Amino acid sequence: MNTLVIVLIAAVCLIAGYTFYGSWLAKKWGIDPKAKTPAVAKNDGQDYVPTDGWTVFAHQFSSIAGAGPVTGAIQAAVFGWVPVLLWILIGGIFFGAVTDFGALYASVKNEGKSMGLLIEKYIGKTGKKLFLLFCWLFTLIVIAAFADMVAGTFNAYETVDGVTKLSAQATVNGAAGSISLLFIAFAVVFGLLQKKLQWKGWKEMVLGLACTVAAFAIGMNVPLVTSKATWTYLVFAYIFLAAVLPMWLLMQPRDFMTTFMFAGMILGAVVGLVVAHPKMNLPMYTGFHNAASGDLFPILFVTVACGAVSGFHSLVSSGTSSKTIANEKDMQKVGYGAMVLESLLAVLALC
């Protein structure tokens, strides 16, 4: 089957889900454009900052869309592309997007409280403690895994027979590391300029794109060749800064710039499908059991998580995005819209 047809069908389903089901939820839940959001009522210039809806969308999408929707869809394809596609579409429209939208809605309607405080309010202190303990343990695992992966990716050295030397990919790895560091630096510059200029629309996009291009252009020509240990320290230093700096200074501009990379990746994939018209070479269905991976249930639903439904997204919706929503009407595109776009990304990875 032509993969372009698969992507078009998926896109139509996801757009329809956003337009009809997402809008129905917004109406059913009582989204009020005239209501004062926590970002407006509690504006402190740190965590609670009224922000343009598309900027919040960029933050939400960049925060939830990482390697998960890409690698998950590819890994689950051992069961065939049809069950993976069906789960991405059904899960994304009726589970994932609803979860993200619902968490965002609940937080905005409750003074911007994070998920832990919401659980304390509606379930009790024991529920809150259990949830926060789980989040703490989960975060430790994720941070440790990703820090090691990132440091390993940027590492310029390799050890062969007990001898440490520069690897053949030292320059490439160093350039990738430089781009990442400069990306953070330019994100701060972007945040400072945006704070002063208050640009919106195309002006904000041009400024963000210019900072993104500058980070790539300089980083590719000035590789930082260093060890994995050094990169590990740098990664944890960045994690600390991201945790303590105001939203508008680092996280929001960083995610806004990251969206350009995701958009470029999606656009490139679509252009490739339109030009090449590749056929789906994977079998439609290989059976309920796979010798290497196990049974379709629960493996399919474990591997395709971020592309269909992920509880982690609720931490983003209630932890950061809810505190920057300037108008309740933006909640649908931020909560529901970012998730269905991630589902489309998963479909592209599958194709």
What annotation goes with each model-predicted range?
Residues 16-70, 295, 299:
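Membrane-interface "cap" regions at the ends of multi-pass membrane proteins
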Residues 42-57, 61, 108-140, 171-175:
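Transmembrane-helix boundary/entry motifs in multi-pass membrane transporters
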Residues 10-20, 135, 140-142, 210-215, ...:
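Selective recognition of specific alpha-helical transmembrane segments in multi-pass small-molecule
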Residues 14-38, 60, 90-114, 195, ...:
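Juxtamembrane transmembrane-helix boundary signature
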Residues 52-68, 229-245, 259, 271-278, ...:
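Hydrophobic, membrane-embedded alpha-helices of multi-pass small-molecule transporters
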Residues 51-110, 121-125, 142-158, 333-351:
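Membrane-interface helix-loop-helix modules in multi-pass membrane proteins
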Residues 2-19, 76-106, 116, 177-183, ...:
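Extracellular loop-to-transmembrane helix junctions
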